[in-house]
């Protein structure tokens, strides 16, 4: 696609920039910076926001989540299609068609871009996938996508090294953008600690989304061991997370009881949904009354929909004496960098992205771990050793003030150098402005062209002509999904026939699992002619009946059907 305008139009797809997630924070930071560049026009494709909803941002923005109830109903019972909807698969085509970008920049986990390489627009724009790869062995889909996009970027050097070891030499690391200007040691730190009644405590902190890959049981066990070995130390564990998320995360109160830990020694962050005030105190359930504004049942522990602002989060970091981040694997783990910038020594599992943050030259100390395999994927995962957590906590507690200051200063400088918005955006601009379209080798193009020369008859030869029905719908994802939901009804109308669904290859996955579709056939323009499909004169055609729901009668004669179509309308 040639550029006909002075600015480079960049469509950026990721979590909505106002979401309180790692991807959301990164999205906000890079969009604010790219928007200021006179050579770049940014457009946001916001995952998590319904398509068609007004989004108040300084730049052009579109929600990617389906708003069509028919599509939502069609994907509801299929987990893979439901996940695709959450990642914007069914609306990204319409957004690309509207804004006609020069560059597509996708920032999500790699599975968010499943089948994107088969989309019609993929070869027309420069494509950059900036993804999080957090475990070994590298996911097969990442290895398949890398040669098909113009540039693959990863969030952690761990992933870059693994990809290059497998022959993918152009992969580069660009860390997620941390606006460290919000995070720094505060002069009124002691006043804040006194306000929240932790002024005499050794506070261990962990900021995280409550999900199973965050090693909460390991941390609680390490905390318990530290307390048992150091009974004279008044210790608190501050878990800044969504305690109420028990269905997909950890039931933290249950683990406290199981491990015999005093509920008063483990703190939670509460946020008022009316006045936005926050409180750090022992967990006592959700939907509490607000002591600041008097609101009823409006105070909950922080969650991805409602958290604290950056200023308040920095205050929470300043309540801590040390930051501890045990996890099974991760793409970057932004709270680690925030904690460093806020003046904390960070204890981090040295696996996956942890290798970018765990060592002394990075302002941290590594946590030992043992390997286990994730049953469903066979990925190598880390289970952090509670004994190592205990030992590192003791090391920090007993560390001299000069050694602490040196390590903290190292961490602050490291974040500014490696993870700053300026550094990240500078690298992104380089790739946006300089990446070239991959050129296929002539011999490869020829082989692929030959492979695509498949005769339609090859799909039809096992079914007699009089038993064939064609449904032709080349695009888009939403229309294909809706049509797919009608195939059972079509089969009931024509029980003696086999249904052949004709669509573009990028939509095969939406159809393949439908038991009422006999075969899926790749679309070509020849399928636009009803006479070619159903026959005329001496030409018998390819199907007994063919339906072209995307064609208007004013455009194409599409309602002949050899006089064999049926209807379900009854006149009384």
Residue ranges and their predicted role:
Residues 443-572:
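Catalytic machinery of carbohydrate-active enzymes
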């Amino acid at each position: 696609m040639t550029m006909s305008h002075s600015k480079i139009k960049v469509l950026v797809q990721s979590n909505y920039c106002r979401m309180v997630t790692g991807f959301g924070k990164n999205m906000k930071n890079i969009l604010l910076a790219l928007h200021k560049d006179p050579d770049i026009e940014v457009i946001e494709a916001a995952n998590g926001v319904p398509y068609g909803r007004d989004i108040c941002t300084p730049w052009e923005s579109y929600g990617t989540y389906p708003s069509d109830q028919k599509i939502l109903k069609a994907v509801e019972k299929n987990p893979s299609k439901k996940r695709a909807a959450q990642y914007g698969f069914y609306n990204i085509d319409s957004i690309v068609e509207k804004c006609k970008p020069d560059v597509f920049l996708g920032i999500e986990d790699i599975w968010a871009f499943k089948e994107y390489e088969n989309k019609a627009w993929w070869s027309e724009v420069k494509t950059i996938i900036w993804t999080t790869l957090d475990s070994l062995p590298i996911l097969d889909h990442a290895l398949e996508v890398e040669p098909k996009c113009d540039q693959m970027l990863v969030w952690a050097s761990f992933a870059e090294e693994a990809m290059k070891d497998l022959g993918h030499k152009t992969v580069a690391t660009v860390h997620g953008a941390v606006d460290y200007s919000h995070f720094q040691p505060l002069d009124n730190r002691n006043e804040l600690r006194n306000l929240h009644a932790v002024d005499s405590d050794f506070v261990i902190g962990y900021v995280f989304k409550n999900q199973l890959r965050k090693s909460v049981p390991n941390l609680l066990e390490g905390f318990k061991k530290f307390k048992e070995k150091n009974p004279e130390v008044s210790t608190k564990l501050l878990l800044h997370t969504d305690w109420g998320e028990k269905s997909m995360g950890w039931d933290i109160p249950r683990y406290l009881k199981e491990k015999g830990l005093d509920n008063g020694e483990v703190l939670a962050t509460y946020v008022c949904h009316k006045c936005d005030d926050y409180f750090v105190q022992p967990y006592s359930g959700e939907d509490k009354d607000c002591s600041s504004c008097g609101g009823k049942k409006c105070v909950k522990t922080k969650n991805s929909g409602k958290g604290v602002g950056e200023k308040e989060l920095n205050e929470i970091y300043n309540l801590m004496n040390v930051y501890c981040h045990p996890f099974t694997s991760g793409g970057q783990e932004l709270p680690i960098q925030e904690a460093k910038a806020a003046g904390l020594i960070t204890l981090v599992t040295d696996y996956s992205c942890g290798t970018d943050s765990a060592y002394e030259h990075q302002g941290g100390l590594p946590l030992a771990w043992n390997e286990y395999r994730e049953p469903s994927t066979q990925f190598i995962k880390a289970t952090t050793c509670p004994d190592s957590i205990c030992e590192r906590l003791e090391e920090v507690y007993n560390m001299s003030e000069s050694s602490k200051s040196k390590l903290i200063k190292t961490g602050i400088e490291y974040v500014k150098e490696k993870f700053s918005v300026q550094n990240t955006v500078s690298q992104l601009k380089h790739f946006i402005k300089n990446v070239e379209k991959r050129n296929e080798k002539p011999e490869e193009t020829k082989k692929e062209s030959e492979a695509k020369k498949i005769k339609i008859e090859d799909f039809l030869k096992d079914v007699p002509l009089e038993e064939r029905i064609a449904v032709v719908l080349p695009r888009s994802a939403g229309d294909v999904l809706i049509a797919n939901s009608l195939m059972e009804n079509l089969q009931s109308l024509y029980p003696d026939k086999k249904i052949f669904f004709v669509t573009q290859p990028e939509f095969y996955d939406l159809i393949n699992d439908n038991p009422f579709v006999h075969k899926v056939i790749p679309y070509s323009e020849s399928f636009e002619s009803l006479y070619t499909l159903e026959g005329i004169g001496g030409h018998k055609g390819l199907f007994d009946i063919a339906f072209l729901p995307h064609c208007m009668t004013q455009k194409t004669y599409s309602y002949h059907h050899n006089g064999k179509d049926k209807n379900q309308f009854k006149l009384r």
